[in-house]
Each structure stands twice: as structure tokens, then as C-alpha cells.
Amino acid sequence: MFPHEEKLIKERLGREPNEVEKAMLEVMWSEHASYKSSRKWLKLLPTENEHVILGPGEDAGVVKFDDNTAIVVGIESHNHPSAVEPYGGAATGVGGIVRDILCMGARPIALLDPIRFGPLGKERNRYLFEYVVKGIADYGNRIGVPTVGGETEFDESLDNYTLVNVACIGLMRPEELVHSYVEESGLLLVLVGNKTGRDGIHGVTFASEELSENAEEEDRSAVQIPDPFTEKLLIEATLEAVHTGKVKALKDLGGGGLTCASSEMAGKKGFGAVIYADRVPQREPNMNPMEIMISESQERMLFAVRKEDLNEITKIFEKYDLEWTVVGETIEEPRYIVYWNDEKIADLPIDLLADVPIIEWEAKSYDIEKDVQTPEISIEEALLEVLSSPNIVSKAWIWQQYDHEVQGRTVLKPGLDATVLKINDEHGLAFVSDGNPSYSHLNPYHGAMSAVAEVVRNLASVGARPLALVDNLNFASPERPEVYWSFIETIKGLADAAKAFGLAYVSGNVSFYNEVGKKPIKPTPVVAGLGKVKLENITTMDFKDKGDLIAVVGTTKKELGGSELYRIFGINKGIAPRVDLEREKQNVEGILKAIELKLVKAVHDVSKGGLAIALIEMAISGNKGFEVDIEKVPAEGGLSPLEVLFSESHGRFLISFEEKNLEKIKAIFDEFAVIGRVAEEMLIFKHENKEVINSDLRQVKALYNSLPSILGE
């Protein structure tokens, strides 16, 4: 809390807050809990369209899938905790987002894990990577919620740090929606789940400031302890309680603990709450009321129920062997009152906890984009280097640790353009996340647009029409003028792109102060998207049959700024790829039409690594080769063969299809060219009638599957 905020609190309260009140206010006025540096700008994001049932403002968003089915979706970050204690930090990140979905009344059915680390050449970064993956795997597997996708990236700006974002979706009938706020006084507040300990105390405060170089030792107590077995019981008990129709409000205890959950639940509609802190079951001896009120111990839920329904609801908790306690009640007067052994120890206007003034920091623009000469590297050398980059290689080592098929809904598995989950006998839900901090570093506006565009292309590539988006915005300190400017530009880019596609953001998260030892991370907006697909139309990236034609949709430009090629060869400048929204929409609609008309056998969007990597991914996925002519790729004039292959221009797809469908497909697209054919086993790139690359599929597979050897396994 800043000095001017402490002064304002004293003025509004008319006195100094006591120790307990001050601790609660520090939690609620933290950046992590209040969004005081971002709230103004988040209002620019579109939050409504025909699919949205419930937009931002509660624990998760709700999207209409059909008349009988709603999808609940949310995304959260657990960056600081995972950088300090990667296993526990990542595991509790999973637990927290699962409870966010659960407390809307939905059964969690799938997770995505967009995760980022420093270069794997350093032992500390490998340690963070391996234990974050293990934390996600262990927790998700034990609660029976599959991790079905995500993205994994390594970047120099994340040295000794990690970004752990987790998205979750849940399934429910629309009439089962439970809100996170009460609409009447006299309700009992029932705390259910784990006992309260000292873990996670000041967790949100710790997440609202930069980490020091010694954070691993200094801040370990701020990281919560995971208990997936209790979480599994909480999932089943909560859903059973919700199905009685007698749960009036529901919140999980996440950041800010009991203070945050109970004050938000009571205060949103102008009610107050009385809390009896001494009734809270304690895991550790001699806990004081301040510790109890702000502890962030995991696997705890807060239910609001009427007195006459208490017995019915608590019998459900007892059936699952979950401890429960009535810790308070809602009151008519808008105050937040805490008792300890019959002594009143805190008494605040409830809006003082939630009504945190906006902070608008200085914003200073920067311009580091600069066109540069692409180095003269042989295509063969470039391909070897890019294909074996940790950012490009197969991430099977990660997702093979996840039980991605538990619950039996997974139709398309990890490693493709998007995962697809079966929702009913006719339709599936596509789910994917994307972000590229290298683009955002060069141009935060266009970097943000690119994340949205890639999500839409990924969804279209599997045959899905986009429904809604969620966003997770990872930034360094907003007190840095350049960082705050990049955040504002990011919001503008996210807004413009979503509006162009007719999409809304239904939930999201902002994570500031991501830096270690005063080293800021790159701007890292992550966007996750949902799409609806007919099961019979699901399309995959793998080449199917020898002799099929291969074509490119879209134009390739000299847009290598932030590309994997430039990164590998140490080029930090260049022009970041631009999103031509009209062209992007046309090509997406064209792809969806071609899929619906059953004209194409394989579709893959072109993104990181450019055309060269996209072709190789299609070949490896289908266990086929190809022969393509670089000169036939639709490209702006003056591009070298190297630039054509490794540019990361947006709006592009690769497709394969039977030759008999060529004329019908050509009629759909403006920017389209056949560049080659699917072959048996060889991967051949030609230029000026010469083979510039002739490689065996087995050699390429060995490079593409080299992550275990990079990790020293």
C-alpha cells in the first residue's frame, strides 16, 4: 500500500485502522486484488456478444454453447509463487482456477497451461520448468481434470523466473448458475474444506511487488500448500450442494483468503457481513485473528445458505468427510465486522475494502521496431537451428505427463492447432491459448492483436467457429512508464482485434510486477479462446495421402521481427508481424467454408517458425513427406527464399486436398497458391528448380522430438 492510500484510508475511516483492519485493507488494496492500475483500461475490452451469458465481474465467465449447455471459463496466473516454489506454486495455480469454475456451479472438464521460462541452458531454469510441469501434472491428474493443451516458451527475459498461466473450462446447465454475491441479509456463511494455516499469508501482497534475487528463501511462506485429494472431494460436494438449488452464493477462498471472499460476497449488492474468526478451523496452533483473516490456505470454499437449509447442505459436506463451520452471516448494514472470542476486533464500512481508487501511472511510449537485413544463412542451417529450438520442438514430453483423456471427452489431443472436447453427440468445444511476447516487445499493440488472431486461426484450423475469449496479461511493474504504456497499447490491440472478429472477453487476469532483481519481463498477453465445432467437421493438421496438393492461403511478407529465426541468430530488431483484420477474417471464413464443404483433408495455421516449420509439423503429424516450390508461395516482392520460409506473417494457413477439389477451393480464396504435393518420406524444398533441402522424415523427427535430450534425459 502506498503512503497516499494509507492517508486516504485514515481520512475515510476517521481514525487509524487497528492491526487486523490494516492487514485486511492491505490485502484488499493490493494490486493483485484491486486491479487499481488496470481497471480503467480494462473497460475498453468488449465483454458482450450473442454468446455471453455472464461477462467479467465474477470468478469466471459463462458462455452459451446451446440451449441446454453453458461453458464456464476463466484464466489465472500464479507467477510469483511458481518462481519461488515451482511445484507448489503451479499446483495451487491449477487448484485455484478449478475452484473459480466450480464456484459458478460448473463441473471443471479441462485445463490449458500457457507456461514460460528462461533459457533451458541454465540449471535454475530447467528446475523451474521441470517442477512447474510436475506440479500441474500431479494436481490435475489427482483431481481428475485433464490438461488438454497450452503453450510452452523460453525467453531470455524470463531468466530465473516463470510465467504460469492456467485456463479452465467447466460445463453446466444454464439454470444451475450460482453467483458469487448475496442478495439478502440473514444468510449463514459456511466455510468448507481444509483447515486454515499460515501458508499464503500476504500472498496477494507478495504478488503485487517485484521479486528480490533472494525470493526463494524470503518468500516461501507466501506460497500456498496444495492438497488435490481435498480438492477432488470439494468438487463433488460443491456440485451436489449446488444441485439442491439452495446455495445462495458461492466463492472460493483464493487471493486475500476469508477477508476477500466474504467481503466481496456480501458487499457487491450493498450488504454487510459479520465474521467470527475464532470459529475458523485452524491447522496450526496459536494462530491470531489477523493470520486467520488473510491466510490463503487452499481447498476452501465459502457458501451462503439460509438457516433452514443449513442441515441439508452440511449433510452433503459430511458425506464427503469435509469439515465445515458457520463462520459468519450477512447483515443489512453495509459494514464488515470481525469478532474474536466475542470481542469486536474489526469494524469497517464494507465498501472501504472494495472501493480502491484507480492509480494512473505515467505512460511513456517507445519505438524499437527497425527493419534490418536478414542475415545470409543457408536454408539448411536455418532449418536445423529453428527446428531444434526449445520453442519449436515437440512438447510431447510435457503433455505425456498429463492425463489428458480423463473424463473421456478429449477428441483432439494436445499438440495440434487446438484441442477438442466432446460436449454432446453432435458438437465439440475447441479450446486453445496463444501469445507471443517477442512480438509484443517490439510492438505491444500489434503483438496483442496477433494473440487474438492466432487463437481465431487455431480454432478455425480444427473447424471451430469462435465463441468467446479470456485474457491473461503478464507485465512488469506498472510504475515503469514504458511498461505502463505497453500495457495500455496491449489493451487497445486486444480490444480492436476482438471487436473485428465479433468476440467478447468474458473473464481475465492481470499480473503486474513480474520481474526479478529489477529485470522486467517482456509484455506477455496470453489469450485463450473457445470455439464450437461439429464433430463430423473436425479437421487435423496431418498430411493424409501421397499425391494430395499442398497450398498456402494468405500472403507472406518481410515480417521477421520477433520471429524464431531472428531470435536464434541474436537479432532483436525487425518489424513485428501485422494483423490485417479484414484479410484475416476473409481467410478464416474461407477455411471454415472449405472444411464445411469437405474440400480439405488437412489444415494448419502458420505461426511460430513460419511456413517451413508448419510444413514439417504437418509431415511429422501424418508420417508423410512433401515436395514444395518456395517460388510458388504468394509473397511480397523482394523476399529471399529464407525470408519466405521463416517469416511469421499472420493470416496464413497451409491446406492439403485432393486435386479434384482444386477449382472449388480456388474460388473460395483471394490469396491462394498451390506450392507442392504430399510425398512418401522425403521432405524437399525447391527453389529455381533446384533442391535446397532434401531431408529424410526420420532425421527431421529426431530433431523435432529432442526436448528430452535438451533436458539431459
UniProtKB/Swiss-Prot annotation:
Residues engaged in binding Mg(2+) 1: 76, 509
Cellular compartments annotated: Cytoplasm
Residues annotated as the enzyme's active site: 32, 78 (proton acceptor)
Name of the protein described by the UniProt record: Phosphoribosylformylglycinamidine synthase subunit PurL
Oligomeric form and interacting partners: Monomer. Part of the FGAM synthase complex composed of 1 PurL, 1 PurQ and 2 PurS subunits.
SUPFAM superfamilies found in the cross-reference section: PurM C-terminal domain-like, PurM N-terminal domain-like
Superkingdom as given in the UniProt entry: Archaea
MF annotations from Gene Ontology: ATP binding; magnesium ion binding; phosphoribosylformylglycinamidine synthase activity
Entry-linked Pfam families: AIRS, AIRS_C, FGAR-AT_linker
This protein's encoding gene: purL
Organism: Thermococcus sibiricus (strain DSM 12597 / MM 739)
Principal subcellular localisation of the protein: cytoplasm
Disulfide linkage: none
Its job: Part of the phosphoribosylformylglycinamidine synthase complex involved in the purines biosynthetic pathway. Catalyzes the ATP-dependent conversion of formylglycinamide ribonucleotide (FGAR) and glutamine to yield formylglycinamidine ribonucleotide (FGAM) and glutamate. The FGAM synthase complex is composed of three subunits. PurQ produces an ammonia molecule by converting glutamine to glutamate. PurL transfers the ammonia molecule to FGAR to form FGAM in an ATP-dependent manner.
Reactions this protein catalyses: N(2)-formyl-N(1)-(5-phospho-beta-D-ribosyl)glycinamide + L-glutamine + ATP + H2O = 2-formamido-N(1)-(5-O-phospho-beta-D-ribosyl)acetamidine + L-glutamate + ADP + phosphate + H(+)
